[in-house]
């Protein structure tokens, strides 16, 4: 029973994280909520590409 509960909780947490990442993609230079303004520039300064904004956190960059 406990393994099933852990599996269900893990699936719920992962689906919430994926949903947040999918909904937080922003077009243009500015991010959402309290993210760093000008995410594209922030990522480029690190040598990365802007991917998405994590609400209330920071920019999500990718190689």
UniProtKB/Swiss-Prot annotation:
Disulphide bridges: 35-53, 39-59, 43-61
Residues forming coiled coils: none
Keyword Disulfide bond: yes
Compartments in which it is found: Secreted
GO cellular component, one term: extracellular region
Keywords, alphabetical: Disulfide bond, Ion channel impairing toxin, Neurotoxin, Potassium channel impairing toxin, Secreted, Signal, Toxin, Voltage-gated potassium channel impairing toxin
GO molecular function, one term: toxin activity
Secretion signal span: 1-28
Source organism superkingdom: Eukaryota
Tissue specificity as recorded in UniProt: Expressed by the venom gland.
Similarity field: Belongs to the short scorpion toxin superfamily. Potassium channel inhibitor family.
Function: May block voltage-gated potassium channels (Kv).
Protein name: Potassium channel toxin MeuTXKalpha4
Species this protein is from: Mesobuthus eupeus (Lesser Asian scorpion)
Lineage: Eukaryota, Metazoa, Ecdysozoa, Arthropoda, Chelicerata
């Amino acid at each position: 029973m406990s393994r099933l509960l852990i599996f269900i909780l893990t699936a719920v947490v992962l689906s919430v994280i994926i949903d947040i990442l999918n909904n937080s993609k922003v077009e243009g230079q500015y991010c959402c909520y309290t993210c760093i303004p000008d995410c594209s520039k922030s990522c480029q300064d690190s040598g990365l590409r802007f991917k998405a904004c994590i609400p209330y956190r920071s920019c999500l960059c990718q190689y």
